[in-house]
Amino acid sequence: LSLSGGGDKTAIQLDMKHANDSLGVSGKVTSVRKILNSWNASPLKVNIDLDITLNGKSLLVRGDIYKTPQQLVSFDIALKSKSFDLTSLVAGSALAVSDGKIAHAASRLKEKSKYFFNEDHLPFDLLPMANGKVNVDIAQLGLPDQEPIRDLRATLTFSGDRINMQDFSFDLGNGRAQGNVSLDKFQSTAPSLSIDGFAKGFTIEQILADAKSKVSGGDTKVAFNLKSSGISMHQLASRANGKIQISVGQAKLATSFLNKGGDFVITVLDAVNPLRKKSNQTVLECAVAYLPINNGLVSVVDTVGVETDRLDVVLNGTVNLNNEEINLKIFPREKSGLTLGVDLGNLIKLQGTLQNPSSGINQAGVVNSAVTIGLGILTGGATILAENAKSMATKSQPCKTALRPWSDITAGAN
């Protein structure tokens, strides 16, 4: 580290290396001596002209910081880069918290948490109380485990204890994502958070950097509009209001890829199709999830649908994000034709919690199926045929049934 003064400027030169990673900072700022002497004593303007280099890729930091005694700091900063990569930085952070005593402490903390969305306090209190803006313009940004995002643009506006991120946008695969984020009263015990946006025109295959994922296709569209408050992920989830919609088009998904979805996803997949483990691939025709949330209660009324080359699947029920309890009934229907009248899907339900999901028996489904079979015997099969026809009519187009107009989720999502 080198600091050298000259006139009203201080030149900074920093070079750091760790393993295969290197970090450098070079450039000039207003005299460090002047900053130390004048901060909160007299009006001060700090000019910043720095070049931050991470593994050979540079991020330019330009702008001014203003400090008037007894007033909040104000600033106007621009971050610009042709190509920057956060992969090693994020990986290094993960490694740092997975080593030695920190790892053991983190492990014990995780074991104690009974919620999928944990109760750890988010570091909102570390955000600065200030006035100003930060403009971000990065042509290509590398992130772990996915293709780089391109043309990243955003404007962050700070106003006391409120931060707005407006016109946040970037290219994703062959598509584009954009949205807005607002965080208010972040120094309080119940900060309020609102997010809205959408992403479209990309495929799952395009955004996965790992060719070993064995995924092809999967035209994807996402839209969301959510509001909540709280200082932890659990509080934010349990108080959430709004809507989320996701749709995925035709895709081929390796079983090994689906198994990375976590306990909840695996439990759903195994409940829908217990024989899937014998196949190394799922041929997806479409999947749609429309999830309205009211005070942390996710209601699913034929609003999650999946179609594969072999099955049509519909989900009904609720997920309570307050206690994270799951109460979902699964209705899978084979495409091979009529069954014997026993809707096996109606006998399956997802239960437990997001942290510890399990599949079980839908008692109401057992009774209904028994009644159907009994009536079928008495009517010579007419009741069974009627029940099958009804099931086919209501469950034969799960994706189309689940999908809502995109403009109902958030403006501009069409």
Q: Each predicted region: which residue ranges?
A:
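Surface-exposed, gly/pro-biased binding rims or lids
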Residues: 207-212, 331-364
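Repeat-solenoid scaffold signature
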Residues: 42-76, 206, 210-241
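Outer-membrane beta-barrel proteins
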Residues: 23-25, 86-90, 147, 204-208, ...
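Terminal amphipathic helices with adjacent charged low-complexity linkers/tails
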Residues: 93-97
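Extended amphipathic ligand-handling, pore-lining, and cofactor/metal-binding catalytic surfaces
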Residues: 246, 358, 366-367, 373
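Solvent-exposed beta-strand/coil patches in large extracellular/periplasmic or lumenal scaffold regions
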Residues: 1-24, 28, 49, 101-198, ...
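Short hydrophobic membrane-inserting alpha-helices and related fusion/pore-forming segments
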Residues: 369-389
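Extracellular loop and loop/strand-boundary signature of outer-membrane beta-barrel proteins
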Residues: 36, 122, 140, 208-212
